[in-house]
């Protein structure tokens, strides 16, 4: 029993899932990204990777794309929840589809941002544990300070350009900082 229990509340909604999901992403994204660069630097394979004729930005962007794709795939079961609620509702289909679509788009933007922050944290250190802790704390702080309001706006079904620009700009900034940090490390 609880406020998000569909059966006992008598109200078919998907809000509960989308209020909990960002908090799970705060832990999932740093966990997925903690090994991307930190482990390669620790084991020495980073030096081997840097001798290949591949630019640093391509390496970082490909690692980011792989981690974000995995995170996006992890979000697919959320659609199962929507269809279950869709068929439980009285009458069938009495669910706010716009809020669901906005929430999914918001989660994709949030996961993109958290993945880039996790990759940046992995760039700073050779330790996977330190990378995870740094990434999780950074994601939590950023979500608590500013991203929560923008995500909740999207979760209501309102897709505002300012929200999208914030997520995209933080993602680009984090990826650029990752490239900058790794370039400085390579030059040492």
Each model region followed by its residue ranges:
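Transmembrane alpha-helix boundary signature
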Residues: 1-5, 33, 40, 80-83
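Transmembrane helix-loop junction
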Residues: 39, 51, 83-87, 123, ...
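Hydrophobic alpha-helical transmembrane segments
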Residues: 17, 46-55, 77-83, 127-129, ...
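Terminal transmembrane helical anchor/hairpin motif
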Residues: 1-12, 124, 131-188
């Amino acid at each position: 029993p609880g406020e998000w229990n569909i059966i006992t509340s008598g109200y078919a909604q998907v809000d509960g899932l989308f209020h909990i999901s960002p908090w799970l992403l705060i832990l999932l994204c740093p966990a997925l990204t903690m090994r991307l660069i930190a482990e390669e630097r620790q084991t020495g394979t980073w030096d081997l990777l840097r001798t290949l004729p591949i630019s640093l930005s391509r390496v970082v962007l490909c690692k980011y794309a792989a981690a974000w794709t995995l995170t996006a795939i992890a979000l697919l079961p959320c659609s199962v929840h929507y269809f279950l609620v869709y068929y439980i509702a009285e009458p069938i289909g009495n669910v706010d589809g716009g809020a669901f679509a906005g929430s999914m788009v918001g989660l994709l933007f949030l996961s993109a941002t958290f993945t880039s922050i996790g990759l940046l944290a992995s760039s700073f250190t050779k330790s996977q544990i330190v990378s995870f802790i740094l990434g999780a704390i950074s994601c939590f702080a950023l979500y608590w300070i500013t991203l929560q309001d923008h995500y909740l706006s999207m979760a209501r079904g309102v897709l505002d350009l300012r929200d999208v620009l914030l997520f995209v700009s933080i993602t680009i900034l984090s990826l650029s900082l990752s490239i900058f940090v790794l370039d400085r490390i390579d030059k040492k």
